[in-house]
Amino acid sequence: MKLTINILFCLILISQYNSANGNLRDLFNNVRGSISSSANKIRQDVKTLFHPSDKSGNKESSNIVFVEDKDEGAVGPARDNKPVAVTPAPVVSTTTQASAPTVATNGTATGGKDDKGRENFNGGCLAGYMRTADGRCKPTF
């Protein structure tokens, strides 16, 4: 860290130093001038790219002529004017037979015994469990 600060300080002192011939100062001025000129050239290129002027000599854009097509002399692909035979689609009947509704009956009889709603339980047991006769899930060993 101290070394880089010392090097920068020395470079600043050297750049300000005027030698007898001015070679060192001319070197830095030449580098700075070339960087400045290339930056100006890039700036001009970008400016002309996004904001083109009419003085740039782009005369092709002003000489655009639109020609309308005429159907009289146009040559296109030959086409037959024969009618195409169309077959009608078959008609499908959509009538349905109505049936009398039936009364749904539960297959299990309660028989006076209180099952607490287990007669309607149709769920399965988890893996590793087995259904008992009264509808509970019991672990298998």
UniProtKB/Swiss-Prot annotation:
It comes from the Eukaryota. Coiled coil: none annotated. GO terms for cellular component: extracellular space. The keyword Signal applies. Residues 99-108 have a biased composition (Polar residues). Disulfide bonds join C125-C137. Residues 83-98 have a biased composition (Low complexity). InterPro entries: GBP_PSP. It holds the Pfam family GBP_PSP. Belongs to the GBP/PSP1/paralytic peptide family. This is Plasmatocyte-spreading peptide. It comes from Chrysodeixis includens (Soybean looper).
